[in-house]
């Protein structure tokens, strides 16, 4: 790989690692039973989508410590993308999101599969033989897919080809990553439908997304490279605010981005009542009548609370209220401040020039984007 940071080439390299690894796993699944083809295809599709930011941050954490390019490190870095793939499958399942990258999410894709025909035994059993509804079966398959992807992330890391002594440095971080990712997702579920609060929402995004998107991949690369404590602490000071900026941008795009570019269903965050910073900032600025509109539209309308949530017109009214009260502009300022903090931190660290340039570019790619 060139010493210069080439995002497209890096993505291709990461995709190649994932495609080979996941194709082998898909083939192994099919050797068990050909009926597992939908699960095998879902694994293969994981290698086709994504910006590969998490792999890039892991790679440049390694390079920031002065280590050279390494194919084995690329495999360890690619494991971060499988962590993300697992988190996405589970998050889409929890939110009942229909689209991701412009394609059906895993549980929606599984639900579209032909349902097995009822057998004569089923039809005439007394009492009738219990059969799982297609929706329940699809959700169960997606749950298993996400679990499998997380297990595969650990396997790809362990089989990366790096020396065992290097890999052992990263094991405590793997444990923290899993704990904090689950904690963040659980915090979001527990706070959905509660009183909006900006501090609470920022804590949710820090643990649900920010840490495993930027800080922890960076630290994993640095740990694998044997980086000193001072460098790791500096990378944390860069990674945490940048990870928050990444998710704040994602929340803005979810409501105000072009669905043709984001590949996600618009209004999903409002429909599920997620405790976003956008919602909290809107609530903070709203008068009593506007707060009543928010309560009436969003309360009790999580994905599994009622069969019919708020209508599109009501959700658009809330989105318009957010803009009217200046919430998107305040979130934009939060993003800009966090990116500035991250880039300023880089200038304080003693980094190789290539790593400094790459991490500066990645900061802008993560937070200033349209999808």
Description of each model-found segment:
Residues 157-174, 294-296:
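Transmembrane helix-loop-helix
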Residues 1-85, 89-131, 135, 186-197, ...:
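Conserved N-terminal diphosphate/IPP-binding helix and adjacent helical/loop segment
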Residues 316-371:
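Short hairpin/turn module used for nucleic-acid contact or packing/dimerization
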